[in-house]
Design a protein with these regions (language model features):
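Flexible "arm" and connector segments at domain edges
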Residues: 1-92
Length: 92
């Protein structure tokens, strides 16, 4: 799967959510916050920051779900900023 496919799929999901939830306002900041929350959830499930703990990470499936949730919001934020191809991203 390439980046263009991911952007296309995310656009379809975003459009569906906006239509079914009647979202008409700019939600960039909310999506930014949602990304931070998902990254925090990912860190919590991997326990990568819990140097004091002896408990291991969550199951791979749980970690993967949080990772994918983060990717969703990265793509969604990119779409709001007009990024649909890695060639036009400013850091490339």
């Amino acid at each position: 799967m390439n980046l263009q496919q991911l952007f296309t799929m995310q656009k379809e999901l975003d459009d569906f959510i906006e239509q079914t939830q009647n979202i008409q306002q700019d939600v960039f900041q909310e999506k930014g916050l949602a990304l931070l929350v998902e990254l925090a959830e990912l860190a919590n499930e991997t326990r990568c920051f819990k140097f004091w703990s002896t408990k291991g990470p969550s199951a791979r499936e749980v970690i993967l779900e949080e990772y994918v949730d983060s990717i969703h919001f990265i793509l969604s934020l990119g779409l709001l900023k007009g990024y649909t191809s890695i060639e036009i991203w400013p850091f490339v």
